[in-house]
Amino acid sequence: MDMRRNNWFISLVILGSLLVSLAFVQSTRALATPALTPVEQLGKLLFFDENLSKNGNQSCATCHDPAVGYTGPASAINAHGAVYPGSDPTLFGNRKPPAAAYAGESGLLRYENGAWIGGMFWDGRATGDILGDPLAEQAKGPFLNPLEQALTSPEELCNKVKAGTYTALFDQVWGAGALDCTQADAVYDQI
């Protein structure tokens, strides 16, 4: 009987130690995660905002889900290299969304050592020449692509951002009055 009680006690001590260790690891992880800067907060809000699409049903995260390495969340589609529907469910993109987790590492499109490197999209068309960053140029594409978020113009995108809950943050990052939709092309470059 004492041996059973002893084993039970030892099991409880081990379980308790594991729980305390797990709690410590989780709290340490939380402390190690730095707070987002205002521009990072704004980017995160834009990335997850489904209202920035034709039908209010698709965000960047719809096809680049952080939970699955920033690619599409449907494993069957990913396994077969198929495409995802856009904001208009009758239209489909022209390729499976690539993982966006490493996207910031591509650099400017350039010819180096006999090969083209850098840029964004499969064909490098977001070169970085316009905004100085191919990732920033790439991020603009899906909003106006009829196969993706399907908005019709930079003005429509600007108005949707202006109707969002983060206009004060947008002004904090880009300056008061930055969401002037009469200057939608300039606003589009900031989004």
Labelled PLM ranges:
Residues 1-2, 26:
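Intrinsically disordered, low-complexity regions enriched in serine, threonine, proline
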Residues 14, 18-191:
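Periplasmic c-type cytochrome electron-transfer domains
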